Amino acid sequence: MFTNIVDFGLNVQEAVEAPRFCGSSFPQSPWPHRAYPNRVQVEARLSPAVIEALNARGHQVEVVGPWGIRNGFAPILVNPETGVYHGGADPRKESVMLGW
């Protein structure tokens, strides 16, 4: 999401709704700390060209449902110039963003 906001200029809601990927090369937190080098899950909404490019680079790509990456976020961004808060609610999980 950070890259979508900073590098691509998406607002917080657009960034949280964007197609997501999840790599498995880094060891997991729970015991026995499994790692799956070069394995990556991608949501089906990701461009087929990107999926092909990942495969061509040797990744083992698993395409999951259109909203299949199940880690949800409710991000908040604060504009340092105005002090205005911007939030997003992730459709992958039951979430809502409220402010007052």
Residue ranges and their predicted role:
Residues P48-W100:
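In a subset of proteins, long, contiguous C-terminal domains/tails are tracked
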Residues M1-I69:
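Proteins synthesized as precursors that undergo proteolytic processing into mature forms
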